[in-house]
Amino acid sequence: VLIIAVLFLAASELVTADYTRDEWQYRAASLRDAMRNFRDTRCSPGGEVCTRHSPCCTGFLCNHIGGMCHH
């Protein structure tokens, strides 16, 4: 009976640890996506002016000489 109890507790710990790791991975992915979305809401699209406070949207580069976003 004692061996069964120890095995049950060990299995419970493994399941809980696995669930917690998955939950943290999900939260990390959600935070990463939220940060991407936040950056893209304040970005300048192609052909628009880019500054330090308004960088180019994902996929565009800022030409700092002219201050315009381009591919």
Curated annotation (Swiss-Prot):
Determine if Membrane is one of this entry's keywords: no
Q: Give the range the annotation lists for the signal sequence.
A: 1-17
The principal localisation class reads secreted
By its UniProt entry, which Pfam families does this protein fall under?
Conotoxin
Q: In which tissues is it expressed?
A: Expressed by the venom duct.
Recorded family membership: Belongs to the conotoxin O1 superfamily.
Please report any disulfide bonds recorded for this protein chain, giving both cysteine positions. 43-57, 50-62, 56-69
Extract the InterPro entries matched here.
Answer: Conotoxin
Q: Tell me what this protein is called.
A: Conotoxin LvVIIB
Q: Name one GO molecular function term.
A: ion channel inhibitor activity
Q: Name one GO cellular component term.
A: extracellular region
Entry text on domains: The presence of a 'disulfide through disulfide knot' structurally defines this protein as a knottin.
Q: Which UniProt keywords apply?
A: Disulfide bond, Knottin, Secreted, Signal, Toxin
Question: Any keyword Signal?
Answer: yes
Protein localization: Secreted
Q: Please list every transmembrane segment annotated in the UniProt record, as residue ranges.
A: none
Propeptide boundaries: 18-42
